[in-house]
Amino acid sequence: MPQIFGRTYSALELGRRIGRPEQLGGIREFTFRDGRALGVRAFDVSSGAGLRFTSLADRALDVCSLEFRGIPLVWRGPGGIAAPQYYQPGDDTFARNFFGGLFTTCGLGNFGPAGVDAYGEFGMHGRINHLPAEHVAARTVWDGDSCTFEVSGTISEAQMFGENLELERTLRVELGANTLLLRDIVTNKGGTRRPHMLLYHCNMGFPLLDLDSILEVSHRSLRPRDEQAKRGLTCWNRGGDPDPEFAEQVFIHEPLACADGFARAMMINRTLDEGRGVALVIRYDPKQLPALFMWRMLGVNTYVMGVEPANCPTIEGRVEAAKRGTLPMLEPEERRSYELSFEVLSGAAEIDRELASYAALIAADSTGPAALGS
């Protein structure tokens, strides 16, 4: 049963108190009508418990904004939202059209730098996040006393004589809850095996990211990508002041699953919500996404900390992944599923309970050295 404003109600009890479910939460479909976002279809979804997000149907149903009780939790890129027609496979297109948001999907054939190989040319972080969804649907589903808001669609990344990959995507949130569930299924609809690289570029920003913020990660190991990242090893998971001279730092993690099978990354700011504290927890299955990259970029305007679960441990892109023997491939008609959840925690009790629970699970792991990043 949904919990609304601190009290649990049955469907019958709620129905007696409201005219329509939208009085509490729901899905609103709209279209942008200005600038480079002109014509982009979108869904605004409210859980009725303080969680609100926007999914862009014409940008692979990626989530461009996330708020909790009116507090923005994610970074928005300076280029804003751009319609799919602004995509070009050059090196700078991703940066020009990168809206940031809760997550931008990188793939399906590549993440990392642009390049060319035996399978063809590919752009930085792939093409999928610039493709519009089809068969898009928004539903409100009652099952007994629980109510779920659901947005779904199919995104096709295909060309003649090339790849034919399909992404089936579903976003779900329950009425009265503060957890967004994401389920993706990627299928190779073509007749030949194809490269399949997938990364979820999750982007936490101000005010969740600020001077006193800290990112906690369940991992077995951590290493810097390069010399620049080495300089930030002592504060890799901390916020700080925006610095116009800041150079990006990327850290490579080996994820560790807790007893429930999911690895975690949690950004905490204990000063938000009038001092009660707010945290954003990202959970993912390391069997599906065995790599995690963390992007620390405390620049001016580009003030963001990225958490990036991926299905390949090679951040340097498809050409390098093939050289190292780490390039994932999809056989004809092969399907792979990916599940992530994004939960907002409010107050010291909820935050400390989450920290204590998976810290204990990590400490109990006996398969090798483990750590809760801090």
Predicted features, each with a name:
Residues H201:
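An amphipathic, aromatic/His-enriched active-site/gating alpha helix that lines ligand/cofactor pockets
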Residues M1-L181, R193-P195, M204-D241, E254-S374:
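Surface-exposed acidic/polar loop and edge beta-strand patches at domain peripheries
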Residues P244-F246:
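Extended intrinsically disordered or low-complexity segments
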Residues Q249-V250:
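Surface beta-strand/loop "capping" patches
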